[in-house]
Amino acid sequence: MNPCLAIIDPNTLSNIALRSVLWDVYNNVEVYTYGDMDSFIRDSNRHFVHFFVNSDILFKHIDEFETLKNQTTVISVGPDKKFSKAGFNVLDISLPEEELMSKLLRIQLVSRYKMEHGNSSRLKSNSELSPGEKDVLR
């Protein structure tokens, strides 16, 4: 069974491009794209090992991903310090191609280790951020 990655972004072109790049960068992964959280949640029976989430969607659904920080990469246009300070990986899609690819290669897909050892994660709703930290993100 190949590791499953999720891209949650309302921009269809961005989804297609990132899926193609992920297939090029990571061998033997399945990549699923979703335009919103509702479609993602309807398909959440899959065991995703990493999530690439649009910054606006993550902002609105921070409670769903805060326990999955190591497995979540925020897709942003430009640097997004509020999410990186909160412990999320941030992928600035406005970077030059070489820098963007380098950043993707550095992202540690927690999933690889877990999938190779029989553990996988599902979306959880447990809370780890304090109310103050949540306010900073909002």
Label each residue range with its predicted role.
Residues 1-118:
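N-terminal regulatory/sensing modules of transcriptional regulators
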Residues 116-138:
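Helix-turn-helix DNA-binding segment
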